[in-house]
């Protein structure tokens, strides 16, 4: 097996390992979808997870009591799963926490019934030296397609945007006039991050956050959509953030290389020592990654200057945190 074949298979395998194990039986749908499933999150709005008959191939995370929003509108966050999995509850801890801070989050894929608890994730890596230089990826030859077809498609991100826009305009919808369709983030982990990159150039998108992911050095259709190359990054004109684990994260170098390639837009790159490709998503309330996600979204979608302090300036919150390594470009 060549190094490249091993690398592609490993990305797929590790991404799956980061997810809970499912029975993949699906959830029977009724008109309006199954009853919302109680979750919570650490934010001011108790969040729930549900499916909607108008968007059957997705999972919706929202504040439980929409009537209590009192004129508050929810920015929209669309999520692509690791391994491009067709399971919208595979990152439920993480997305519930984000929604609890006043966001409408929509994941690709329906709710599927959970089986046994997932694996604990990759072991902690040795702590690397402080502020190591960013290294380029070693995969410099063309990547063959060595994966089964992605179970979700980047077009489902656009479907979610259209659905949320329609529900915001539809009298009688619980989302009527409660969605800020002018503030939209696309995000995803691993393979789902590639899906987010593909649609980040859409004019409706406000920001993109790429988790444990990045494009390959050579063109690849890993996300199930079009074949993407680094040049596709030039079509993106909104602020981006790349968040990953350390060098044990199989996509660490991919994220580094994307950061180096991007020239003109604001881009934030950070990775956490001792964390691998599985991130902290399955920890209570999504762990530290969720807190970072909430802060970035509060800044980019709500204009929260206090949240910006986590990312902006030489003494930014993550910059002075010894667990994190940070690089930025054009970030103001």
Language model: regions and residue ranges:
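Bacterial N-terminal signal peptides
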Residues: 11-23
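N-terminal cap/lid segment of alpha/beta-hydrolase-fold proteins
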Residues: 29-72
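Short beta-strand element of the alpha/beta-hydrolase
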Residues: 71-82
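Short amphipathic alpha-helix adjacent to the substrate-entry channel of hydrolases
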Residues: 89-112
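Alpha/beta-hydrolase active-site loop
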Residues: 124-181
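Primarily recognizes the serine-hydrolase "nucleophile elbow" in alpha/beta-hydrolase
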Residues: 161-235
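The feature captures the conserved acid-bearing segment of alpha/beta-hydrolase catalytic domains
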Residues: 206-283
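Alpha/beta-hydrolase-fold serine-hydrolase catalytic core, especially in secreted/extracellular enzymes
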Residues: 265, 274-276, 283-332
């Amino acid at each position: 097996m060549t190094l490249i074949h091993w690398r592609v298979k490993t990305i797929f395998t590790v991404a799956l390992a980061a997810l809970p194990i499912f029975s993949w039986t699906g959830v029977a749908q009724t008109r309006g979808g199954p009853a919302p499933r109680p979750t919570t999150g650490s934010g001011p709005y108790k969040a729930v997870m549900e499916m909607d008959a108008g968007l059957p191939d997705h999972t919706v995370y929202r504040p439980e009591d929409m009537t209590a929003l009192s004129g508050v509108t929810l920015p929209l966050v669309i999520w692509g799963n690791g391994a491009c999995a067709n399971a919208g509850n595979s990152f439920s801890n993480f997305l519930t926490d984000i929604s609890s801070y006043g966001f409408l989050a929509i994941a690709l894929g329906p709710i599927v019934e959970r089986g046994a608890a997932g694996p604990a994730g990759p072991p902690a890596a040795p702590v690397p030296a402080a502020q190591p230089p960013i290294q380029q990826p070693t995969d410099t030859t063309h990547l063959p397609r060595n994966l089964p077809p992605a179970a979700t498609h980047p077009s489902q991100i656009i479907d979610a945007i259209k659905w949320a826009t329609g529900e915001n305009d539809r009298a009688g919808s619980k989302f009527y006039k409660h969605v800020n369709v002018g503030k939209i983030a696309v995000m995803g982990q691993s393979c789902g991050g590639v899906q987010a990159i593909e649609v980040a150039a859409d004019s409706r998108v406000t920001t993109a956050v790429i988790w444990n992911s990045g494009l390959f050095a050579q063109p690849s259709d890993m996300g199930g959509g079009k074949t993407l190359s680094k040049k596709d990054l030039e079509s993106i004109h909104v602020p981006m953030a790349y968040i990953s684990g350390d060098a044990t994260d199989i996509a660490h170098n991919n994220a580094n290389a994307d950061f180096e390639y991007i020239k003109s837009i604001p881009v934030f790159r950070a990775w956490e020592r001792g964390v691998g490709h599985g991130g902290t998503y399955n920890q209570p309330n999504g762990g530290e990654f969720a807190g970072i996600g909430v802060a970035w979204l509060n800044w980019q979608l709500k204009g929260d200057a206090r949240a910006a302090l986590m990312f902006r300036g030489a003494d930014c919150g993550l910059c002075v945190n010894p667990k994190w390594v940070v690089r930025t470009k054009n970030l103001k």
